[in-house]
């Protein structure tokens, strides 16, 4: 690689300190694993390079399958610390609950692209008993007709391939979709603040 062993060790230590990799001693060497945070950072850099070298699309399109969640979305979406911000920043208070969508693994770069975008931030807050994380919202449409926001959360129990949607509408009722239903989410890459 053209650098000394000490310089390589220092770089690895910095990456580990930032939570981008983990290192484990194995025999006479070490094993290096990229963390989820590191994978997201790699995808973010990939998207920047890709957009610099290729024509940039004007939207991200994500397909997936509707799945049941843990019924926590209704609780969180109805917290007073969030509802006022939703009304102020998105123009509506979401229908209680989130729509959970398992995306195909091939959409990892698109999801990482969203993670690297600004979106509309709903600030985290504390209610005296516990703290609640931030929510990053991206305006879009579901199946070409239903206005919604894809949300990325500071704290979530879902894996990286699951995204959540909110809307002022009861999406399940409006679409007649049940678990297992296929959906398409379209998110413009230029988001208005």
UniProtKB/Swiss-Prot annotation:
Organism encoding this protein: Cenarchaeum symbiosum (strain A)
One GO BP annotation of this record: FMN biosynthetic process
HAMAP family: Riboflavin_kinase
Region (Riboflavin kinase): 60-193
UniProt pathway: Cofactor biosynthesis; FMN biosynthesis; FMN from riboflavin (CTP route): step 1/1
Chain segments carrying region H-T-H motif-like: 1-59
Residue sites binding Mg(2+) per the record: 98, 100
Binding site for CDP: 69-74, 169-172
An annotated Gene Ontology molecular function: nucleotide binding
Protein name: Riboflavin kinase
Keyword entries, A-Z: Flavoprotein, FMN, Kinase, Magnesium, Metal-binding, Nucleotide-binding, Transferase
Family note: Belongs to the archaeal riboflavin kinase family.
Needed co-factor(s): Mg(2+)
Gene3D superfamilies xrefs: Riboflavin kinase-like, Winged helix-like DNA-binding domain superfamily/Winged helix DNA-binding domain
Binding site for FMN: 156, 164
Role: Catalyzes the CTP-dependent phosphorylation of riboflavin (vitamin B2) to form flavin mononucleotide (FMN).
Enzyme Commission code: 2.7.1.161
InterPro entries: ArsR-like_HTH (IPR011991), HTH_ArsR_DNA-bd_dom (IPR001845), RibK_CTP-dep (IPR039063), Riboflavin_kinase_archaeal (IPR023470), Riboflavin_kinase_CTP-dep (IPR023602), Riboflavin_kinase_dom_sf (IPR023465), WH-like_DNA-bd_sf (IPR036388), WH_DNA-bd_sf (IPR036390)
Domain of life: Archaea
Reaction catalyzed: riboflavin + CTP = CDP + FMN + H(+)
């Amino acid at each position: 690689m053209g650098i000394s062993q000490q310089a390589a060790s220092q770089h690895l230590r910095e990456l580990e300190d930032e939570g981008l990799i983990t290192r484990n001693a194995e025999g006479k060497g070490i094993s290096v694993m990229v963390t989820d945070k590191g994978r997201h950072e790699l995808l973010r850099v990939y998207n920047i390079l890709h957009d610099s070298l290729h024509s940039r699309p004007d939207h991200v399109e994500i397909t997936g399958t509707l799945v049941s969640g843990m019924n926590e979305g209704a609780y969180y979406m109805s917290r007073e610390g969030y509802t006022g911000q939703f009304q102020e920043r998105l123009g509506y208070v979401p229908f209680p609950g989130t729509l959970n969508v398992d995306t195909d693994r091939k959409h990892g770069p698109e999801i990482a692209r969203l993670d690297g975008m600004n979106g509309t931030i709903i600030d985290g807050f504390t209610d005296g008993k516990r703290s609640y994380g931030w929510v990053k919202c991206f305006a879009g449409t579901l199946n070409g007709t239903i206005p919604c926001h894809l949300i990325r959360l500071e704290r979530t129990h879902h894996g990286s391939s699951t995204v959540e949607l909110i809307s002022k509408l009861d999406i399940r009722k409006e679409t007649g979709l049940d678990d297992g239903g296929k959906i398409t989410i379209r998110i413009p890459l230029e988001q208005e603040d």
